[in-house]
Amino acid sequence: MARFTLPRDIYHGKGCLEELKNLKGTKAVLVVGGGSMKRQGFLDKAINYLKEGGMEVQLIEGVEPDPSVETVMKGAKVMQEFQPDWIVAMGGGSPIDAAKAMWAFYEYPNTKFEDLITPFGFPELRQKAKFAAIPSTSGTATEVTAFSVITDYNTGIKYPLADFNITPDVAIVDPELVEGLPVKQVAYTGMDALTHAIEAYVSTLHCSYTDPLALQAIEMVLAYLPSSYNKNMAAREQMHYAQCLAGMAFSNALLGIVHSMAHKTGAAFSTGHIPHGCANAIYLPYVIRY
């Protein structure tokens, strides 16, 4: 027997960020990263949409790349004080991953980080809040996956937390958020998406449900990543969808040794910060050859 899990709703297309105003609740925490969403005006849009829907909004800003256990704990404390019924995470993989882990500690304050390391060992979530994810990069696909990557810098270990409980309830895949993405990020996140799709397709857990998603994602990345890098906005839109398809595939088929090594590299060389997608791009051809 196998399981295939996706978010309840996936909104896609230009302007679909507006769907935030249709979330039903009274309080929302909005988790973001280093400031790009604020500079581009999307943070204000998101706040206004949530308020238009009748929600009080609390902001958690400044989630760093490769978020730490400490960042997760600080965010969970804010949530415990505010008591939201929606957690909305907007940005690259880091703020969304961090918010997923915060979610667990918000609902279960006595849980320890060590309790979450065991794959598929999370407690039952949605006792207090639901989760909406809005990606601003075209690579991690954490908006549709059962994974969250958190780094313990004290031990130098990057933990891929895994549980279907942390699959978001709602994913909002709006290509307008990636139109201003720097070309290096386009390249790194695009290679992350390609690696997701390839590893899902050759995974020992691949199946008839995941294969079409993985293959379509591979074809789309090959077709659109070069043009996306060259700032073709139509190609960036298609890359945003391709990475989401790859996420649907690997969330259910899982990944392989490329990602295992890339996670270790990101934690071991944290001071120099090797971007995750860059590490994937380095390892992928050697693993394929192997």
Residue ranges and their predicted role:
Residues E70-E176:
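Glycine/threonine-rich beta-strand-loop-alpha-helix active-site module
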